[in-house]
Amino acid sequence: MLWEFLSERLSFRDPHDEGGAKNGRDLMKMFTKAAFAAAVLAVGAMGTAKAEEANYVLSTASTGGTYYPVGVALSTLVKVKLQPKQKIGMSAISSAGSGENVRLIREGEAQFGILQGLFGYYAATGTGPLAEVGPQEHLRSVSMLWQNVEQFIIAADAAESGTLSDVTKLSGASMALGRQNSGTIGSNAALMAGLGIDINEAFDLVYAGYGPSAEALQNGQVKGISTPAGVPTGAVSQLLASAGDSVKFLNVTPEELAAADGGRNLWTPYTIAAGTYPGQTEDIQTMAQPNFLATHADLPEEHVYMITKTMYENLPFLQAIHPATKAMAIEAAIAGLPVPLHPGAQRYYEEVGIEIPARLIAQ
């Protein structure tokens, strides 16, 4: 009870109170490290069948995005289904997002975290923004949660093939590829690099969120936009309803996907079904990367197994709490995961008949 009280209070701190935020982080650090140590010591040996008492912390992102409410949904499910008998609890906390979540898991301040797929790849390989700290060899995947679907839309008069290669021919044009320093512009930069394009040199970048980006395309202020998100995306719906045939939603060919992915095995094919958006009469073939649930390799196999099993046996519960989880399906549980599976998650997936590729088996 004390743990739940502190978790709830500290995760709802005033973002403008810097002193309070620091004190909250210090307190959270103390209690989460204690909880993590207690959980591991209580189990004694990894993989024991008996589920000992544990209270885990799930780090998400800011309260205004999707990560936080999905984290609350997951932690609520664990509390309702596992805490009464198995004594496995979970509390969701807000954070600065994927980058901080990697650090929190590494330092034992959180035992689970929601990560963008590309950031998981950076963590696994020690590249990008994690080049200085190196590979996070302790990081493990639990499940894909929902997918960030890549949505490239350009002015119709710039569309030659109607595929992603059209973007590579817009050198010198104004493009809206996300806010500055955002995950959106980071993933767009990685994808374009795979196609041989340095976005900072090739384009006149307009830094904006999805709504303003869509408006800029409709008004002719930019030649193209990219809005990776769950579908349907509100800004895209509004754009296609208003702009009609003056814009073109680009398809991604298998060859373009392979080049853009750059050997990461992160982006996978995704079909936006006809009728998803206004005026969309045909399927759109694009690609998507996962937002996924990560954990620490040292967590007990039995606990991660039970959490994974509980998630997939109670999808209607999750989906009733937040619509983003409607994308979850056992068939897509390991799609695009960038780091090896935790043995507990692997065990559950093998039980339900999912074939695990070698790259996702922890060594």
PLM region descriptions:
Residues A45-A51:
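Sec/Tat signal peptide C-region and signal peptidase I cleavage site
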Residues K248-M306, Y348, I356-L360:
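C-terminal lobe and pocket-closing loops
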Residues L10, G24, A229-N251, E302-Q363:
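An extracytoplasmic/periplasmic, membrane-proximal ligand-sensing/linker region
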Residues D26-F36:
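Bacterial N-terminal signal peptides that target proteins for export
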Residues N55-P84, N148-N219, A335, V339-G344:
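Bilobed "Venus flytrap"/periplasmic-binding protein-like clamshell domains
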Residues S75, R106, I114-E132, A189-G196, ...:
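A ligand-binding cleft/hinge motif common to bilobed small-molecule-binding domains
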Residues S91-R103, D198-E215, V231-G234:
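Short helix-initiation/N-cap motifs at beta->coil->alpha
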Residues E132-Q151, T276-I284:
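A structural signal for short loop-to-beta-strand junctions that line the ligand-binding cleft
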